[in-house]
């Protein structure tokens, strides 16, 4: 019987391999700690002090190891976001659609396409994006906002049964990772990241080399340059110490320097991961509050027999508002909560299908 862990890992690998050319490019440009170790070993054997110092120049190493293999994709995503902010939805969609499947930013592109369609009142296409993200292959590794997108869109079309199903899926698929990330904000280390550290060899880090760590760590944690830089220092100093001790070449002063680098980089690596986890935990907390708010609204609509005019339910438009407001069209009263600088007027449904259960 195939285990859940194996299934998730296989799904992640399939996703990563959807863009074979991109992955191959990353490998070709990758920096290998093992290969570096062989060069360092040769320099130690030859007692070539200058070559050893050159190999231990971390500024040079970071520049060569942490190359940007998806800069154009990231730039397209950033430009698409700027266009979206300007309400140039068609132009932003054009760029989102250019982000290839299997790249590190594809999940974000699909989610943001969903919000694009949502703002254009195209609920069908918004749901198409969210359902892609919440498919069995991806539902445990995408960010929590994908669930908010689907839930809010379902509220907009009065699919109350769908809302409760989405929230149940959120609890089932995301609770474990949300809790793990919350704990990580305090510790900076867990079993999943310890495995990543132990196995890390190629830089920059790529998704296909990270196994099932996505289930227990912040979204796109491996794209953070500061984290990668500290991990690189840790791995290089660790490898250099192994070589020096194996060759028994003395160099106690160099060993002491490397040992300090190793310890410092490990502490900074943990601190950075804790910061990433803390940031994501704050966002996750907001998402949970939003989902709770939507659920309360759905329950209120189901159990309260309000008489609403067709005119009230005919527009369903969105408008700019003050920070942290969500307004439903049932009575126009604002719900103040940890919401992200926008107000939503939920699109109403025809009276006959309003209570879709």
Predicted regions located by residue number:
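"A position-specific structural signal for the A-helix of alpha-solenoid helical repeats
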Residues: 37-41, 77-78, 112, 148-149, ...
């Amino acid at each position: 019987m195939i285990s859940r862990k194996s299934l998730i890992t296989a799904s992640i690998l399939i996703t990563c391999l959807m863009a074979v050319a991109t992955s191959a490019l990353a490998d070709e440009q990758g920096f290998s700690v093992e290969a570096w170790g062989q060069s360092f070993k040769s320099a130690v054997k030859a007692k070539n002090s200058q070559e050893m110092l050159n190999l231990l120049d971390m500024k040079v190493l970071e520049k060569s190891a942490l190359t940007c293999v998806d800069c154009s994709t990231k730039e397209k995503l950033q430009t698409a976001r700027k266009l979206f902010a300007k309400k140039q939805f068609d132009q932003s969609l054009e760029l989102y659609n250019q982000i290839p499947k299997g790249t590190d930013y594809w999940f974000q592109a699909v989610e943001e396409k969903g919000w694009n369609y949502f703002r254009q009142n195209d609920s069908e296409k918004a749901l198409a994006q969210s359902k892609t993200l919440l498919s069995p292959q991806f539902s445990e590794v995408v960010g929590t906002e994908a669930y908010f997108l689907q839930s809010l869109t379902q509220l907009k079309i009065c699919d109350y049964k769908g809302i409760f199903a989405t929230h149940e899926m959120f609890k089932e698929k995301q609770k474990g990772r949300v809790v793990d990330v919350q704990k990580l904000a305090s510790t900076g280390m867990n079993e999943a990241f310890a495995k990543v550290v132990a196995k890390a060899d190629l830089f920059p880090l790529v998704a296909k080399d990270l196994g099932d760590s996505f289930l227990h760590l912040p979204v796109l944690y491996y794209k953070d340059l500061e984290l990668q830089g500290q991990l690189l220092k840790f791995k290089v100093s660790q490898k250099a110490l192994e070589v020096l001790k194996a060759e028994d070449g003395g160099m106690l002063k160099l060993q002491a320097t490397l040992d300090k680098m190793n310890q410092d980089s490990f502490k900074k690596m943990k601190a950075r991961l804790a910061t990433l986890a803390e940031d994501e935990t704050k966002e996750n907390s907001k998402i949970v509050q939003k989902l709770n708010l939507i659920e309360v609204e759905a329950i209120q609509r189901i159990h309260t027999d309000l008489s609403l005019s067709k005119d009230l339910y005919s527009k369903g438009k969105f408008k700019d508002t003050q920070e942290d407001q969500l307004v439903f069209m049932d009575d126009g009263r604002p719900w103040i909560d940890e919401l992200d600088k926008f107000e939503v007027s939920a699109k109403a449904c025809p009276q006959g299908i309003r209570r879709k259960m």
